Amino acid sequence: MKHLLSTEDLSLANAIRILDTAEEMAAVGDREVKKLPALRGRTVVNLFFEDSTRTRISFEAAAKRLSADVINFAAKGSSVSKGESLKDTAQTLAAMGADAVVIRHWASGAPHRLAATDWIDAAVINAGDGTHEHPTQALLDAFTMRRHWARLHGTPSAGADLKGMRVAIAGDVLHSRVARSNVWLLRTLGAEVTLVAPPTLLPIGVGQWPCSVSYDMDETLAKGVDAVVMLRVQGERMNASFFPTTREYSRRWGFDDNRLRALDSLGLKDTIIMHPGPMNRGLEISSAAADSPRSTVLAQVRNGVSVRMAALYLLLSGDTREPALTPNAAYSTKESH
């Protein structure tokens, strides 16, 4: 694996390899000294053309825990705001000796462009490009789900996939790079995925995605789900009215207090509620749901550091071979429900 640009082209073997390596990195986070010398002498650049405090800090923490040197580059106030191109910026970073570039860009495809050129000889990690993809968010979501799924089955999570897990991804799918990355990765891992959204917030061509589509949140919950991923309503990307009112949106597609109570009445005692953050409390998710024991929001933040440590380590370790797939036999033979 030379770059991490998309989950669509991530093989099952590589996906499980990243998740298993993240398990090892998580164990480091439980130690008193949360640091490894694995990337000492390497330089990781966080190249952010869009603001994202959470993702940048997570990548910075991941790189520093591996003893890498970190350079944070924000487009605001930089030469980029004066008209410098992506090519010129990349070549400048190459001259500084960057070994990995974590890029977030407003334009879909920018990380792929950077990786495909000879502007810089460095590993490229997509930290979110437009409305296209956000692979490390999908990986940390899958990591969180896999740990939960393994606990339910009483098996180790290492080597396991997500066969039989039912996942609903609900909300602003149209503008969500998280939804796209999650659909591809979760299907690769064997989960059954349902998108839940109003028709106005579903992208053209969604029928070709490897998932089912529903317009009814309550109907989806009634069919049974093991995890619900609530997506942020991205008002900053909307230049028109995509739903009547915020109150109507919350009532029909948000995870409110009534739906939180409904999980118990439906017998879904082990269903978890997820959100990539930041949350619009009272819109796509109620405070009661976000703060409930079912919520994995803080676990996702914690797991994000481990997953990003794994990605950086694997990309900079020099081993680009496709790993052999050795699934957890005990887990794979469990009867899915």
UniProtKB/Swiss-Prot annotation:
Pathway: Pyrimidine metabolism; UMP biosynthesis via de novo pathway; (S)-dihydroorotate from bicarbonate: step 2/3. Carbamoyl phosphate binds at R54, T55, R104, H134, Q137, G277, P278. Gene3D superfamilies: Aspartate/ornithine carbamoyltransferase (3.40.50.1370). It comes from the Bacteria. Keywords: Pyrimidine biosynthesis, Transferase. Pfam families: OTCace (PF00185), OTCace_N (PF02729). It catalyses: carbamoyl phosphate + L-aspartate = N-carbamoyl-L-aspartate + phosphate + H(+). InterPro entries: Asp/Orn_carbamoyltranf_P-bd, Asp/Orn_carbamoylTrfase, Asp/Orn_carbamoylTrfase_sf, Asp_carbamoyltransf, Asp_carbamoyltransf_Asp/Orn-bd. Its EC number is 2.1.3.2. GO terms for cellular component: cytosol. One of its GO terms (biological process) is 'de novo' UMP biosynthetic process. L-aspartate binds at K82, R177, R232. One of its GO terms (molecular function) is amino acid binding. Heterododecamer (2C3:3R2) of six catalytic PyrB chains organized as two trimers (C3), and six regulatory PyrI chains organized as three dimers (R2). Catalyzes the condensation of carbamoyl phosphate and aspartate to form carbamoyl aspartate and inorganic phosphate, the committed step in the de novo pyrimidine nucleotide biosynthesis pathway. NCBIfam families: asp_carb_tr, PRK00856.1. Belongs to the aspartate/ornithine carbamoyltransferase superfamily. ATCase family. This is Aspartate carbamoyltransferase catalytic subunit. It comes from Arthrobacter sp. (strain FB24).
